Amino acid sequence: MEKNIPTLYEWSGGEETLQRLFRLFYDKVLQDELLGPVFRNMAKDHPRHVAHFVGEVFGGPTKYTGEDKGSHAIMIAHHIGKMLDEKKRQRWIQLLLTTADEIGIPDDPEFRSSLLGYLEWGSRIAVINSQQTENPIGETEPMPRWGWGETGGPYVPK
């Protein structure tokens, strides 16, 4: 018997839930003593773009690469030269998980394991790329995809 397993996007609550999550999250970020200065000049539509990016990564519609005209390289470019550090990375994750709890994002162990795995992976990549002066990937690199399974092995810089 085959199971009909939803995508992380579907399980999270989809577009409306992700938009709400990132809107409320970035409201908190702007008020945060550590993260506020990093994001004080963010574009008004930044939370929407991040919701579209994460939605697409989690198996949802291609709104980030479609209507937003984004790409993985463009998302990485937003982090170049930001000089993020471990304290900021951990605070970013903490605020996002707190916001997820507050709005009732699913808290079953399987989903939260996948969510936290993605946040750990993505935020560590953001810190690495924030130390760069040039984008390490090209415009043709595919968008990341995240699901319920395991990673593809350790991160090894090129």
Range-by-range predicted roles:
Residues 11-16:
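Short, solvent-exposed beta-strand/turn "edge" segments of beta-rich domains on protein surfaces
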Residues 2-8, 19-108, 112-118, 125, ...:
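Heme-based O2/NO sensor domains and their adjacent alpha-helical segments
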